[in-house]
Amino acid sequence: MFFRNKICDIAPGFITLVLARILTGFAHGVYFSIGSTIAASLVPEEKRATAISIMFAGLTLAIVTGVPLGTFIGQHFGWRATFIGVSILGIIGLAASLLLVPNNLKNGKSASLKSQFKVLGNKRLIFAFLMTAMGYGGTFVVFTYLSPILQKITGFQESTVTFILLIYGIAIAFGNLLGGKVANKNPLKALLWMFAAQGLVLFAFYFTVSSPVLSIITLFLLGALSFVSVPGLQLLVVQIAEKELPGTEDVASGINIAAFNIGIAIGSYAGGIIVTSSLGLASTPWIGALFLVITVLITLYSIRLSKKD
């Protein structure tokens, strides 16, 4: 990470910068997939979702603090300075991993390349990946355009929107930790209620978005629910892989991270189509809610599959 961000810092042109960012992005899926399984292995089985939620809380806190801090550094010291800062954080992260991650971790069963490809053929895992992609697709239909929604529809000033987004980020971190506790015992059942609640709040946001007070209340609830399912989804994927394809836990976890990013791309793209169509910005909440309706149906079918097994 240090060297890749350093390449961004010294990039002579746009193409080099983009290629360096792509190289940096390769580490994202690997880090979070392996990090999830390591976090889950460090605690008793009944606390695995909580451990995963704590790890992902670091991501949400980094987004809440890092985005405004990076913007500040870029505005005052230039965009290259932000990559220098990220490179330094990479060194700190490496040192922390070397010092804090135990060396005596139990090695899981190794899996052949053929068995790893079987992850994409496992019905239960496929539906878990679909839950991730559709659930976060619904989130990002709205989240991608949240700032213009709050300014153009709700009527907030840009400076106020920045503060509201900070509150939204805090709610995300809170929801992430809460999701870990709720999903510890039965992640699949917990996910059903999480997705249903998120869909209802997204639908409610369609009606409250024009009211400053009601929109803030709805946004706090939406923030708490936006990433609440992350720990449960990661735990579910790991549990299915452990049971049906031992040794492929890291691979399954990595594909789930990929599904998360695919969901972001789908949601953002769908939101863009809606915003530029006759439906407009105001329709993004109920379109996002439709994504969650589909996610709930997928989850119900996944519960049915688990009962058969």
PLM features: residue spans?
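A membrane-interface helix-boundary motif in multi-pass transporters
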Residues: Q75-I88, I273-L292
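A late C-terminal transmembrane helix in Major Facilitator Superfamily
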Residues: I240-L279
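Cytoplasmic helix-loop-helix junction between adjacent transmembrane helices
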Residues: P12-T16, A20-G58
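Paired small-residue
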Residues: F3-R4, P12-T24, V213-L221
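Extracytoplasmic gate region of multi-pass secondary transporters
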Residues: R124-L166
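Helix-breaking motifs and short loop linkers at transmembrane-helix boundaries and internal kinks
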Residues: I10-T16, G155, T208-S210
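Helix-to-loop junctions at the C-terminal end of transmembrane segments
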Residues: G175-P187
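C-terminal membrane-cytosol helix-exit motif in multi-pass small-molecule transporters
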Residues: S87-K106, I298-T299
